[in-house]
Amino acid sequence: SLPLSVADMSEVLTFIESNLDRFRAELYEFLRIPSISAKTEHVEDTRRSAQWLADRMQDAGLEVEIIETPGHPVVLGEWRGAGDAAPTVLVYGHYDVQPPEPLEEWVSPPFEPTERDGRIYARGSADDKGQLYMHIKALEALLTTHGSMPVNVVVLAEGEEETGSPNLVPFVEANLDKLACDVVLISDTSMFSEKLPSLGFSLRGLAYFEIHVSGARSDLHSGE
């Protein structure tokens, strides 16, 4: 399909404006789920977050799977309606959140979304449920108003980003065909300004080292 025209985008934006209250209410539901992946007592909450997200992705018009891993599941949504010749965009995000402690430093409860000065305060609102949900709502707006998009889209949402993504690499290696794409859009990066769109092209990443040191069996004088 052809790229969207200015008139097409106007229709999409009108849909978004007319559904903002619903979008906000849905996001609040998402933020109320304490999907703390690092704590075993929140295993069921994290799974509930995955199921909730899968349902909303399906509502948006994607074909959705919840795929088990040795840890928390991956939610995978696909829309392939643009055809094999069209490029594919993969949107990455995560539905798990950091523990909220220390609780005494919160002005409002971490899992009860509160709006102050035009900002939503809750654990996960900016890392990463808010951004991830924004992309899903954008897809819903496009598919509802036009029934198609000029590109294929894959949405990959994991539930272990806050614990170092231990099962993401094996998942990717086992699903290379499903995840094949032309560009990856990561919904979990910084913004320089609300008024300055930007594209981050690299991140610091993580490096792990294991160091083994051997020495003398007893203390030696520094000159020996």
Label the predicted regions:
Residues K39, Q98-P99, E162-S165, F192-E194, ...:
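Flexible loop/turn segments at secondary-structure boundaries
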